A protein has these predicted regions:
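Specific transmembrane alpha-helical segments of multi-pass solute transporters/efflux pumps
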Residues: 62-105, 147, 231-249
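Glycine-/small-residue-enriched transmembrane alpha-helix faces in small-molecule transporters
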Residues: 1-44, 156-183, 203, 307-315
Length: 315
């Protein structure tokens, strides 16, 4: 049982780690707006560097043998490749594409619709029974999304339709990522699966947009710092801090505190980039956050929290 001091340390780690995830989306938006960096290049570099660094850290630890052992299991190897290309790359590309065509605040909140998609999938496949919490979550999700995208006016979208499409695809990709990776994570652990998933996704994207295909001659300190922040803080360190928090907190607690990610994305977008965020949009964002709380409080909270843990660590 963790001491009070350890629990406070866990709270700090999960809140700061999730905030780094949220801030990385805002930094990516700033990068897209102020430079010629493309979504494809950033996805390639983010996944390649983060994956390599994470696998290097694992190789330096006690679990170094598992880095290559996973490839000796044919079933796991095939699952890992599918996870890396469809899951990891799918989530990263659609999320950053939504930011590139819209803004980080809306993209992050749309991606948080993934738990609702998971609930719907479970209901359709009859793996879960329908509960009152599911109805409440669906109503909150639909109402929150409507307010977020329209700011209360059905005639106007707050972001481009393309950004909405990418955002919804991001939520769908994240739902697949969460469900598909479950058996891999149980067998091999989060760090190893995520590390290889990132590297595989980065290699796959590299065939479309190689990491060296970028003009850095006009780059300033701002561009270099932005890319470094996205890779180190927004991906690697955020992931490490979240996993560390699970040593001292219950998964359900970490899951709830992980909601500081969209809060950080919205706040930084408004305060730093001057993104317009109306009263109705704020109400919509609140609905989505309440939806996450409702789902985490279901009787199957243990399983839901585990799924939410897998959902969070992709960023």
């Amino acid at each position: 049982m963790a001491t009070q001091k350890q629990r406070m340390y866990g709270f700090f780690m999960v809140i700061v780690g999730a905030a780094f995830w949220g801030l990385s989306g805002t930094v990516a938006q700033h990068l897209f707006e102020t430079s010629d960096v493309s979504v494809e290049w950033l996805v390639t570099v983010r996944l390649l560097l983060s994956g390599l660094l994470l696998l290097m850290i694992i190789s330096a630890g006690k679990n170094r043998r598992a880095v290559w052992e996973i490839w000796k299991d044919q079933k796991s190897a095939i699952q890992l490749i599918v996870f890396g290309i469809v899951g990891m790359l799918g989530v990263q590309y659609t999320f950053l594409a939504s930011i590139g065509t819209g803004n980080a605040a809306v993209a992050t909140l749309l991606q948080y619709l993934a738990p609702v998609m998971i609930v719907l999938f479970m209901l359709v496949t009859r793996k879960n029974s329908f509960q009152s919490a599911d109805i409440c979550a669906l109503v909150l999700a639909m109402g929150g999304t409507f307010l977020l995208l329209t700011n209360g006016s059905i005639n106007n979208l707050t972001v481009s339709p393309l950004s909405v499409i990418w955002g919804l695809l991001s939520a769908a990709a994240l739902a697949f990522y969460t469900l598909y990776s479950s058996s891999l994570l149980k067998k091999w652990g989060s760090a190893l699966v995520i590390g290889w998933g990132m590297l595989i996704g980065g290699i796959g994207m590299g065939f479309i947009h190689p990491p060296w295909d970028v003009d850095v001659q006009g780059w300033t300190i701002s561009e270099n710092v932005s890319v470094g922040f996205i890779v180190i803080f927004g991906t690697l360190l955020g992931f490490y801090m979240y996993l560390t928090s699970l040593k001292y907190l219950f998964p359900q607690e970490a899951s709830m505190l992980g909601c500081s990610e969209p809060v950080a994305a919205v706040a930084s977008s408004i305060l730093w980039l001057g993104v317009s965020f109306g009263l109705y949009q704020a109400a919509g964002a609140a609905c989505i956050l309440v939806m996450i709380f409702v789902l985490s409080q279901k009787k199957s909270a243990g399983k839901s929290a585990a799924l939410k843990k897998q959902t969070n660590i992709q960023r």
